Amino acid sequence: GDFKYDRLLSKWAVFKEGADVDELVSHARYANVDAIHAKQSVEAVPLKSKKGLGGLINHGLLTHDLDELGISSATINIPISNFMHLSEQPGDILYTYGGKTYYFNEQYLISSFDVVLQQTSQRGISVAGILLIAPSGDAGELLKHPDYNGVAPYTMPNMTTVESTQCYAAALDFLAQRYSDPDMRIAHWIIHNEVDGGIHWTNMGDKPIATFMDTYLRSMRMCYNIVHQYDQHSEVFISFSHGWNIAAGGGWYKVRDMLDLMNQFSKAEGDFFWSLACHSYPAQLGNPCTWDDAQATFSM
């Protein structure tokens, strides 16, 4: 077709020749993460303390707040479909990936991300970008999972077609390249939001937990493999709520079950360095007295 496919996104399996169809006789394996070709190298951003801040935005008191708070880490939302286009709009940056050109709103990037990241980089703050995909705009429509329920604010990326997979990979490659700049740095990436609550947040329909995790793990691996071409110190984080042994909401998954599947998939398909980004909320979100939580037990 028109796409130049990067085998960094591929996995391989062993098949046995059959009379009518070939038979799968092994787990699929992804590329060895230690052998990913480095297009560039940057220094790690060390954590200086455990103090951090969530949800950075560009505002008039940003530099004052960063200086006064003395944080070492922070997060920033990266809503891909807000600034990515499939056809050129005025002021867009043209970016070619896999033989196809995609378009990114430069002014949005500057005002929403660049200005903030320049300030955090000057202060040695380790920033994690939270990858979010709202099913809006032409890029969001292409990236929308085919079983998205039409209600949740975000969709699981659609990795069921070459066109949509390449679009998602192009967004990841663009962001990884742009923000592996030491003067404008995103050090780590959080993959979507509260995936144990996929029914309400990162949605791909009502799926068995193993099916959901198989898809989510592909998104994590794509990000990890692409980013590590530009920043070998970067980690990808799985985003959880506070429902570890008990689901945090109706129709949600248990975090512990998801972690067990992460380990099983990684063992079978090739391990990589994933990390946890959990929301340490109380059982009742409106009551911060965690010592009163009856369900907060040592049960892991």
Question: Where is each model-derived feature located?
Answer:
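Substrate-binding cleft/loops of secretory-pathway carbohydrate-active enzymes
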Residues: V236-A277
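Substrate-binding cleft and catalytic face of glycoside hydrolase catalytic domains
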Residues: S72-A248, A283
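Non-catalytic positions within long, well-ordered alpha-helices that form the structural scaffold/packing
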Residues: L66-D67, S121, E269
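Boundary/entry segment of secreted carbohydrate-active catalytic domains
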Residues: L9, V25-S81
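Aromatic sugar-binding surface patches on proteins
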Residues: G1-K4
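Glycoside hydrolase catalytic-domain groove-lining segments
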Residues: D260-M300
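Short, acidic/polar
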Residues: G55-E68, Y168-R178, W252-F265
